[in-house]
Design a protein with these regions (language model features):
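Conserved short "hinge" loops at termini or chain/domain junctions
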Residues: 1-68, 105-117
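Short loop/turn elements at secondary-structure junctions
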Residues: 61-117
């Protein structure tokens, strides 16, 4: 079974934002939904899917797909971080972008493999 943790709360935690601090929730939700749309285009997750608050979980998006869970969580975290709070260092930004490209490749590869199989 995929993770039943709230998508919003896990991304906030990874961004270093306390779960009870809601000042940026609407901005973060918008960026999460943008990223989920990218994942939809890759063939990952349930389609169409978006979050409206803290109720939606990773299991809601991925179902029982444990294989993609950590890849997707890391991808969403990094993508939201790059939009919401980009690093000041160009070296860190480049490292994040390279990681995002690698994650995109891996996620698309898994989705293509499952389609063929």
């Amino acid at each position: 079974m995929a993770d039943s943790e709230s998508i919003l709360q896990s991304i906030k935690k990874n961004l270093g934002i306390m779960s009870d601090y809601g000042q940026f929730d609407q901005d973060i939700i918008m960026h999460i939904n943008t990223t989920l749309n990218f994942l939809d285009q890759f063939g990952a997750g349930k389609q169409p899917f978006h979050i409206t608050g803290a109720e939606e979980t990773w299991a809601d998006f991925l179902g029982d797909d444990e294989e993609k869970l950590n890849l997707v969580k890391t991808y969403v975290t990094l993508k939201v971080r790059m939009i919401f709070d980009p690093p000041a260092s160009s070296a860190v930004s480049q490292a994040y972008n390279e990681t995002l490209k690698e994650l995109e490749f891996r996620i698309i590869s898994i989705c293509d493999y499952k389609e063929e199989g």
